[in-house]
């Protein structure tokens, strides 16, 4: 492990993360190691978030450890955003918990004078990403969506409704095209990942699929 990574994961990590976030304002895009979860106050030393990622209403963001958020992505936590352990979010992805797509027509020029909480037609809804879900670059997740654990959201996918665990979702609008358990089954044919697989209970299902006719 590189010296810098060891320092990030040491007791100095929290302070180094704060300094890195400050320097990010003046530097080219880079990954910031470590993040203090606003909800729990815990330091996620293995989480990495790009210096160019935008977090809206950060105090309503709950984020697990081992999370990766790449360059120029938007995390809108206005109505509550939960990103569970191990999720990865590609570049230029957008996760939104509120929107004004109807409200601007209904309120017209009055829109800017009405507080967010009172705007009629405003779209609101918390978003949750289940553990070890991958969100491809350029994908958009709309307000109110819950995505299960172990999912694969393809590049450029628009997710407008809930997604069950272990789903493969692609397209605009996004549609379920398969299961990551079937994808992972192919890897289990080459090597046994029982020890490291993120969800031990799913290993039984994968192995059952290996023996299915």
Residue ranges and their predicted role:
Residues 145, 156-157, 163:
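Short beta-to-alpha loop/turn elements within the nucleotide-binding domains of ABC transporters
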Residues 84-92, 150, 154-156, 166:
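Outer-envelope exported proteins of Gram-negative bacteria
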Residues 51-63, 68-145, 172-173, 179-181:
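Flexible, glycine/small-residue-enriched loop-and-beta-strand segment within the central core
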Residues 1-39, 45, 86, 99-105, ...:
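Terminal amphipathic alpha-helical/low-complexity segments used for targeting or macromolecular assembly
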Residues 47, 67-69, 153:
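Hydrophobic, membrane-inserted alpha-helices
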């Amino acid at each position: 492990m590189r010296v810098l990574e060891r320092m990030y994961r040491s007791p100095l990590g929290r302070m180094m993360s704060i300094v890195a976030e400050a320097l990010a304002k003046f530097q080219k895009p880079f990954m910031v190691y470590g993040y203090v979860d606003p909800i729990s106050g815990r330091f996620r030393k293995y989480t990495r978030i790009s210096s160019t990622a935008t977090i809206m209403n950060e105090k309503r963001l709950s984020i697990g450890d081992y999370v990766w958020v790449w360059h120029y992505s938007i995390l809108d936590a206005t109505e509550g955003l939960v990103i569970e352990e191990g999720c990865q979010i590609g570049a230029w992805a957008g996760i939104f918990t509120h929107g004004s797509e109807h409200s601007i027509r209904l309120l017209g020029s009055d829109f800017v004078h009405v507080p967010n909480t009172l705007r009629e037609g405003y779209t609101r809804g918390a978003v949750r990403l289940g553990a070890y879900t991958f969100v491809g670059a350029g994908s958009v997740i709309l307000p109110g969506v819950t995505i299960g654990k172990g999912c694969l959201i393809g590049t450029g996918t628009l997710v407008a409704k809930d997604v069950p665990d272990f789903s493969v979702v692609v397209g605009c609008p996004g549609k379920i095209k398969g299961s990551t358990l079937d994808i992972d089954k192919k890897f289990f044919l080459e090597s046994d990942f029982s020890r490291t697989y993120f969800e031990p209970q799913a290993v039984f299902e994968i192995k059952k699929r290996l023996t299915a006719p």
